[in-house]
Amino acid sequence: MDFNQSFEDIESQLDNFVIRKNQQSEKSTGKCGPEVHDNVPLTISQIERATQDPENENVFITDDVHPIHFCTCIIYAFVTGNGTHNESFMKFMIDDGTGSLEASITKKPFNGRVISSLYSEASSLASSEAYKSIAVSMMRLLQVSMEYIDPTRISRGHSLFLRGRPNRFRGKMGLDAFQFFIDSGRSRNMEIGFVDYLTDWQRRHKTMQNTTNK
């Protein structure tokens, strides 16, 4: 660490790390057979039509001309209503214009308690001039962290990024989400950006499949 940096500089770097933390590899190649991908951008209609790989229960296959084998996916959708919540999950009905399904989002209560405890400690330090600057910065970072782990903040009308995997229960396809991000912006920039990313990713996959099959 550069000791000439201000607390604001350090906070900016930490905030940047939280937002741009390394994600899992986008794809992994098995010993044989098709490539199995992680974090694939998909539409809800693709998830609804996906089937489980009979040779690997952790892998799903899209029902496309150029099928995608994947373990985890990313979607962007609008919250249209609540499902039936339980002790472990918050459940929401989501729609992206191509289809709708129920998404289950893990509550992660332990992480929430840890962050709340740290926030209380930082808040008590903020009353001291010696620690006020770094304590206030830490409080802001902890507040941002809660936005990524507390699904109770989600409500009807929110737009979400969700990372998870399909789950078929009683004949209906749903999504088990491990991570979420609430798009609180008033513009549609993030939605449009996701559509562009999805289109580009699937175009590259199609090109790769055509090249492989030649």
Swiss-Prot record:
Listed result of changing residue 89 to A: Unable to protect telomeres from fusion events
Main location class: nucleus
One Gene Ontology cellular component: nucleus
Effect of residue 101 to P: Disrupts interaction with moi/modigliani. Unable to rescue null mutant phenotype
UniProt keyword annotation of Nucleus present: yes
Subcellular location: Nucleus; Chromosome; Chromosome, Telomere
GO BP annotation list: telomere capping; telomere maintenance
GO molecular function terms listed in the Swiss-Prot or TrEMBL record: telomeric DNA binding
Result of changing residue 91 to E: Unable to protect telomeres from fusion events
Subunit text: Probably homomultimerizes. Component of the MTV complex, composed of moi/modigliani, tea and ver/verrocchio. Interacts with moi/modigliani and tea (via C-terminus); the interactions are direct and require fully intact moi/modigliani and ver/verrocchio. The MTV complex is recruited to telomeres by the HipHop-HOAP complex, consisting of HipHop, cav/HOAP and Su(var)205/HP1 to form the terminin telomere-capping complex. Interacts with cav/HOAP; the interaction is direct. Interacts with Su(var)205/HP1; the interaction is indirect and probably requires cav/HOAP or moi/modigliani.
Entry protein name: Protein verrocchio
Organism of this sequence: Drosophila melanogaster (Fruit fly)
Lineage: Eukaryota, Metazoa, Ecdysozoa, Arthropoda, Hexapoda
